[in-house]
């Protein structure tokens, strides 16, 4: 069409203008400006909302060269042959001729090509390229953690949700590329460029609608899985999981309704004239914003490793890519409000941005955790445990701790779960007693297992430790709760009782042969067992400490002798001695612990005949050993009686009484009577206020061969009255003193015969003490 000037130009030549008008009179075309009003014969009035052109039907366009009007408002040179295929129903292709450049077809095609390349790059990262990790401060390639062994933590694995999501995005963008090329070629054949129509043709396809819904579902699930990894607490993981499932379900429902039921609505600009498209857009926006907020919160909490670290110089690049990928939904939400035309090609960027937000953030988190492990691997702290996590993770399949190891790893590996009291699948006690049985099982495991493993080390023979094939060194975790200490059998304090002579002590008596052969026997340990078989096997062993006083020495001596005999049998290296009657109950408990602990796994099985037969055989064998075990007679052993020391406060009372007597006596009488007492061999003390009182002590009977006089005898330990009373006062230091030996500490009539072992005696009841009578002097 040829443009025509509607208003006269004052600078134009009137002669040339008239000639041009006469030449174009037969085929006149008019350019109608925006805002013009057209009035039709039927009275209808049309207001032009955009520039238009009027062309008379008699104009022969095939013989003239006219410019073509493109959708962007510009004019390019060309022939009219490019518009010969237009029809009357193609007016919708020229709905907007003045779209800005950022909303035209060129940025849309470039954006689609760039996002497709990024999508395939993510797929290559997930499926082909090996992962990088930190190894001793150097970033290397590989698929393992810090070590390549079985104990290393693998950080190279990727969840399958990310792989499916990235692959679906790449497939979707490939289909969008094919549809865009087809629609652009059709517009090129028409000689026009309409970005809005191009976008509607591409996104309106049924195949792309279906693949987009599937891709979005896996994208949101992958992001939810990434969020679950960010937070270690089990409670937070559960909250994130169910919140994500609810939002993803609602988003899929409303997106499906918006794509198929409300397909006639505007797909390129969010003009929310109906509720379903608005809700679909709202749920998609909520998922993106929540994901971005939680990832930013995690990066702030881990700011020490998240943005820069000397061991990983490229951490800042990964951090920038992660932040950009998670902020894409927020940025385009702002652009949708301020510039709605951006939605034409912004959908592709948001599409691949959601995939990158999951893949790159996962890599970011793995690098942060690798730096944390590298820094804390030499620390002394253990795993971080939160309150309530053990109860939330409790299940019947995960009841036992530690978990059951492989069968081929040895007999010792299977014992980690045998002492917990559970069954083969972790213990059926969870269904019987609830979740609290997990705590009690863990407590019983740690209380019983170390005592059974360390028990052979307490024997007198070091060879006995190697007789058990199941005893192998293992590294166990510390107990969750400290074990309750065994009750200590402490004797009653004799000074706090009303009668100091009423306390009796029972001690073991050993012959000289036993002392020289084995030395001091180890104390008997009181071991408690939770299972029925072990409690029956060790019931007699525990009864030794709770027996009556009369039978306690015999039972203790019996257990001590049997323990020595068992140690001798173990040191010989022959396992046949384990079945002889001379084996002790402690060795039996130690050797039968692996077997009894294996039976604990099947204690709730009614049809486990093998376990029942083994338990019955163990019980009968213990009964036979109890019958054939020899006993020692400890009732006829010699007894030596040792008197109890004086009670607290008696010496002080006597001292005060002696001081009162000394101060009330007269000095002259004491001097005269003390001279007279030198020949009689008595110690005179003055008592009373007026008359002197003489106290004499009879000397004890002595042996016939003793010719030592009283003054020449070695000075024994003085009584508290003499030492702290009269002889420590400065007033009586010049008085002569005659020391009289103390009386014997036991009744000569009750003196026993010479014991077999003078070094070890038995304590008994204190007899009545006979002191010399005190008679006043005449």
Swiss-Prot record:
Record's protein name: pH-response regulator protein palH/prr-4
Low complexity biased stretches: 749-759
Region of interest: Disordered: 394-499, 514-605, 660-778
Swiss-Prot/TrEMBL keywords: Cell membrane, Membrane, Transmembrane, Transmembrane helix
Mode of membrane association: Multi-pass membrane protein
Main function: Required for the proteolytic cleavage of the transcription factor pacc-1 in response to alkaline ambient pH.
Compositionally biased residues, Polar residues: 457-466, 720-732, 769-778
Membrane-crossing residue ranges in chain numbering: 109-129, 161-181, 202-222, 238-258, 276-296, 315-335, 342-362
Main location: membrane
Intracellular or extracellular location(s): Cell membrane
Pfam entry (one): PalH
Biological process according to GO: cellular response to pH
């Amino acid at each position: 069409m040829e443009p025509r000037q509607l208003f006269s130009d004052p600078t134009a030549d009137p002669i040339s203008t008239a000639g041009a008008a006469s030449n174009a009179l037969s085929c006149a075309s008019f350019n109608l400006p925006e805002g013009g009003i057209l009035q039709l014969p039927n009275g209808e009035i049309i207001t032009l909302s955009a520039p238009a052109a009027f062309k008379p039907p008699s104009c022969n366009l095939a013989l003239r060269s006219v410019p073509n009007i493109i959708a962007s408002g510009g004019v390019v040179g060309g022939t009219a042959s490019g518009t010969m295929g237009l029809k009357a129903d193609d007016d919708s292709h020229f709905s907007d001729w003045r779209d800005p450049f950022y909303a035209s077809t060129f940025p849309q095609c470039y954006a689609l090509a760039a996002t497709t390349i990024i999508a395939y790059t993510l797929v290559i990262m997930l499926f082909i390229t090996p992962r990088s990790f930190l190894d001793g401060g150097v970033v290397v390639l590989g698929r393992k953690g810090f070590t390549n062994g079985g104990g290393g933590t693998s950080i190279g694995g990727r969840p399958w949700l990310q792989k499916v999501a990235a692959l679906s995005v790449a497939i979707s963008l490939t289909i969008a590329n094919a549809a865009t090329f087809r629609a652009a070629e059709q517009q090129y054949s028409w000689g026009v460029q309409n970005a809005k129509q191009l976008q509607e043709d591409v996104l309106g396809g049924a195949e792309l609608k279906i693949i987009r819904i599937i891709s979005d579902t896996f994208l949101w699930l992958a992001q939810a899985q990434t969020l679950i990894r960010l937070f270690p607490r089990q409670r937070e993981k559960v909250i994130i999981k169910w919140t994500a499932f609810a939002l993803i379900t609602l988003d899929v429902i409303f997106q499906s309704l918006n794509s198929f039921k409300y397909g006639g609505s505007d797909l390129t600009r969010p003009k929310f004239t109906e509720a379903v498209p608005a809700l679909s857009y709202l749920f998609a926006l909520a998922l993106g914003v929540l994901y971005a907020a939680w990832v930013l919160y995690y990066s702030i909490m881990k700011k020490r490793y998240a943005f820069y670290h000397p061991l990983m110089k490229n951490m800042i690049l990964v951090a920038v890519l992660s932040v950009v990928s998670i902020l894409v939904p927020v940025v385009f939400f702002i652009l949708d409000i301020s510039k709605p035309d951006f939605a034409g090609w912004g959908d592709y960027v948001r599409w691949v941005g959601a995939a990158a937000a999951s893949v790159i953030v996962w890599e970011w988190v793995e690098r942060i955790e690798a730096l944390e492990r590298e820094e804390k691997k030499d620390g002394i702290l253990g795993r971080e445990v939160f309150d309530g996590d053990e109860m939330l993770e409790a299940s019947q399949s995960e009841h036992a701790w530690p978990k059951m190891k492989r069968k081929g790893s040895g007999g010792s590996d299977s014992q980690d779960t045998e002492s917990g009291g559970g069954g083969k699948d972790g213990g059926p006690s969870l269904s019987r007693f609830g979740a609290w049985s997990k705590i009690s099982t863990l407590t019983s495991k740690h209380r019983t297992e170390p005592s059974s493993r360390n028990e052979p080390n307490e024997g007198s023979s070091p060879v006995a430790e190697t007789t058990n094939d199941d005893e192998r060194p293992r590294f166990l975790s510390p107990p969750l709760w400290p074990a309750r200490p065994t009750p200590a059998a402490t004797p009653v304090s004799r000074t706090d009782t009303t009668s100091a002579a009423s306390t009796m002590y029972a001690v073991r008596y050993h012959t000289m042969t036993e002392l020289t052969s084995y030395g001091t026997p180890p104390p008997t340990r009181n071991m408690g067992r939770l299972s029925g078989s072990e409690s029956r096997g060790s019931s007699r062993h525990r009864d030794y400490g709770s027996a009556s006083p009369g039978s306690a020495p015999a039972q203790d001596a019996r257990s001590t002798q049997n323990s020595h005999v068992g140690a001798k049998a173990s040191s010989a290296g022959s396992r046949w001695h384990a079945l002889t009657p001379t084996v002790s109950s402690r060795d039996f408990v130690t050797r039968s612990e692996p077997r009894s602990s294996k039976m604990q796994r099947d204690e709730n099985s009614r049809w486990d005949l093998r376990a029942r037969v083994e338990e019955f055989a163990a019980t009968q064998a213990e009964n036979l050993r109890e019958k054939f075990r020899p006993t020692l007679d400890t009732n006829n052993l010699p007894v030596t009686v040792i008197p109890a020391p004086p009670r607290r406060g008696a010496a002080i009372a006597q001292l005060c009484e002696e001081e009162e007597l000394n101060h009330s006596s007269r000095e002259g009488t004491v001097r005269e009577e003390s001279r007279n007492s030198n020949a009689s061999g008595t110690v005179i003390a003055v008592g009373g206020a007026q008359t002197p009182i003489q106290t004499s002590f009879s000397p004890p009977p002595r042996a016939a061969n003793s010719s030592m006089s009283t003054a020449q005898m070695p000075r024994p330990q003085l009584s508290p009255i003499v030492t702290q009373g009269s002889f420590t006062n400065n007033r009586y230091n010049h008085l002569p003193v005659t020391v009289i030996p103390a009386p014997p500490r036991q009744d000569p009539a009750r003196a026993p015969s010479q014991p077999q072992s003078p070094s070890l005696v038995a304590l008994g009841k204190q007899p009545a003490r006979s002191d010399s009578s005190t008679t006043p002097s005449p």
